[in-house]
Amino acid sequence: MKRIMTTAAVVALSAGMAQAGGVERSTQSVGILFEQGRYAEFNVGGFNPDVSGTVGAGTVSSGDMAPGYGTYSLGYKQALSDKIDIAIVLDQPIGANVGYPAGTGYPLQGSTATVSSNAVTMMMRYKLPNNFSVIGGLRAEQASGEVSLSSGYTMKTSDETDYGYVIGAAWEKPEIAARVSLTYNSKITHDFSASENVMGGVPTSFATTVPESVNLEFQTGIAKDTLLMGSVRWVHWTQFDISPPGYLGASGGVPLVDYSNNSTSWTLGVGRRFNDQWSGALMFGYEKTQPGTTGNLGPTDGYKSVSLAASYQASDNIKITGGVRYVDIGDAITNAPIGGVFSDNSGWGAGVRVGINF
């Protein structure tokens, strides 16, 4: 039960998870370290938000400014001994895809922005007495970005790779499929070279910090073939800003992107095994709306979500899991001078995971 149900839970948690606080597109889970034996997985997903707002007392609409996108991740885990497990994970920790439609009359019509990243995380778990274990690892993260505003401002960064770490601890009670893990992901600061076009092309440089975060993941059996599971994720988003010097000068010191509040995302749900081949999970997610306004390149604030997942044990060593997620995106008012009102927005996410034990 433990292996099948936790797999279903992970996909339910991650399908469309990118709509959580800030620009994150990965929950940075350490769950792969607890898979049995030698294990490999491939995950692919997509999220299709519908985000629009208005100005002029609702008379001018932005149109859908949040195009859909896809994500992927790869993972491999093996035991080096009865006390040591190692894993490597490739994922996309942060990302953004903004595209205000042209011809709407909205102040940012035709503006676009992208943020992309890739990361490789190598982790190790060392088992201690009494079902405790410690976790540690290193992360290499590559990031870049590009923006083009309707005002004529453009900016493109270099691709930069920098490094961070993950540390944590876990406790298990296999008899009831119980597990709790607490992990800390360090911040990673990227020093970008950039080309800005304010009044002509200008080479510049600036630093952006991908923020630190803390993950609490848990599960426990509550009845035969039934698990209660969930997570709490805190992200220090006030560490994150995009502040190219040319843009700062033209805007009077206002960053291109920043966040005035940190985020805490919650998930809670139930998983159940129906038979030796099929299991499923139902998960709920929540991130509260924060006070104040939001950036015009990210006009969302908090969310509520529901996810469904099903897992099929195709053979003794292959399992396939699919999940769908509906997200009710929180209302937001964007920063002055635009002051766009974004409400009644939502999105759908879906993901598929193939896991192989060998």
Which stretches of residues belong to each language-model region?
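Residue-level marker of intrinsically disordered, low-complexity segments enriched
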Residues: 2, 8-9, 126, 354
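Short hydrophobic/aromatic segments of transmembrane alpha-helices and their interfaces
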Residues: 2-3, 302
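Hydrophobic alpha-helical segments, especially transmembrane helices
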Residues: 3-4, 273
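Outer-membrane beta-barrel biogenesis signature
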Residues: 4-44, 175-177, 187-188, 278, ...
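Beta-barrel outer-membrane channel/assembly domains of diderm bacteria
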Residues: 16, 20-68, 73, 77-82
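Outer-membrane beta-barrel porins/channels
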Residues: 21-22, 52-60, 70-73, 79-358
